[in-house]
Amino acid sequence: MLKIFNTATSKKEIFKPIKNKKINLYVCGVTVYDFCHIGHARTFVVFDMIVRYLRLIGFQVKYIRNITDIDDKIILKSLKEKIDISAFTNIMIKEMNKDFSLLGISPPDEEPRVTNYIIDIIKVIEKLIKNKNAYVNDHGDVIFSINSDKFYGTLSRQSLDKLISGTRISIDKEKKNSSDFILWKKSKKEEKFSWNSPWGKGRPGWHIECTAITNVFFKDYIDIHGGGSDLLFPHHENEISQSRCLNKNFRVKFWMHSGLVIIKNQKMSKSLGNSFFLKDVLEKYEAEVLRFFFLSTHYRHPIYYTEENLKKSEMSLEYLYVTLYGTKPIFDPIEGVNFEIDFFEALNDDFNTPQAFSILFKLARKINYLKKIDLSKSNFFAFRLQKLAGYLGFLLNTSQYFLQKKLPFDEEIIKKIESLIEKRNFARKSKLWKEADKLRDKLIKLNVILEDLPEKTLWRFKR
């Protein structure tokens, strides 16, 4: 029985979709004004894992993740780079997809770009004005009135006064309330990036985009709405308020939020100048290591981004690959099934990946024990380990590929190593221990790690 922590109620609840086994799932996507950073990676690895698991246990998931391809930062960046805005956003989206693909993040079922839904956004704004939830100010901007929604502030579970004091909200004399927000921003005369509307040329505000897109794809309900915890207020609060005012029958059953990335005891933020581009991190660490790192912490908790923690993840993942090294995974319906039961129990408890990881490492210890006494039996458990880890999106490569990747390959050195191992094995069988030790020392100098099993000796380069 799957339980999910619901931000709206601040508790774990048994998950039941609104309609049978079909799930409407929406995650706020990237504003493509620059390369993706590790905060993006954390959020989308988490929701990739969640979607994979929901499908694994039998749900039909309709997964939508938007792309914001128009806003002030995008306009400024394209002008700075002296490149057409659509060409610029296409480049950024291509880079985003490349990074996400390396991390094993499967694409959503639909990835709507905001600029393709301007007409839908205008229709939504027109209805909000008609319902007296929005007004046009003297500048010609369309503004949402938070006072028109008596439930405003309930999602983030704070009083409006606290929400205002705890958030950077600009005070504008053109607003009836300082925390009212823009739905449609009227363009200045010199601005090129605008669309015609009943209120003159302009472009949409950020919050209205998700409301309009979810209205197109989901109409009356979303089973799971996700995003980073930094979006809870004001973005998600504003979004759900707009959606309620647009459609009184609209509901989100579960709100899910992933934790922040912490760097040197501060949340990662471009405004603080402490963010890391994902592409730069991927030059130093393999994508599988980074995915492992993100899932090693519970999705709701903050994750501490340090070189030490990345190295720990690299070593942990290497341990699992070393465990599989030398095995030939074979399915058995009985062996290791208890590990699988425990693994599913962990993920059914609000996607508890740290607990699921602990099951994988228990399984690895079992395999390493069996490799020394019954290699053929270890193959059954190796199959189970590979299968369960695969559900989370790792251990998808061969051990040989992972362990030797990025290491120099020289055919002559390989031949020399295998010759030394053969001589050492002969010396051991002949009980020529001193000779065997000398040969082992030569192999160590060649950066070789040996693993002696009853039937054979495995070797690999030290990474």
From Swiss-Prot:
Zn(2+) binds at residues 28, 210, 235, 239. SUPFAM superfamilies: Anticodon-binding domain of a subclass of class I aminoacyl-tRNA synthetases, Nucleotidylyl transferase. It catalyses: tRNA(Cys) + L-cysteine + ATP = L-cysteinyl-tRNA(Cys) + AMP + diphosphate. A motif ('KMSKS' region) lies at residues 267-271. Its EC number is 6.1.1.16. SMART domains: DALR_2. One of its GO terms (molecular function) is ATP binding. It comes from the Bacteria. It is an enzyme of class 6 (ligase). Keywords: Aminoacyl-tRNA synthetase, ATP-binding, Cytoplasm, Ligase, Metal-binding, Nucleotide-binding, Protein biosynthesis, Zinc. The keyword Magnesium does not apply. GO terms for cellular component: cytosol. Binds 1 zinc ion per subunit. The keyword NAD does not apply. Its cofactor is Zn(2+). It is found in: Cytoplasm. ATP binds at residue 270. It holds the Pfam family CysS_C. GO terms for biological process: cysteinyl-tRNA aminoacylation. A motif ('HIGH' region) lies at residues 30-40. Belongs to the class-I aminoacyl-tRNA synthetase family. Monomer. This is Cysteine--tRNA ligase.
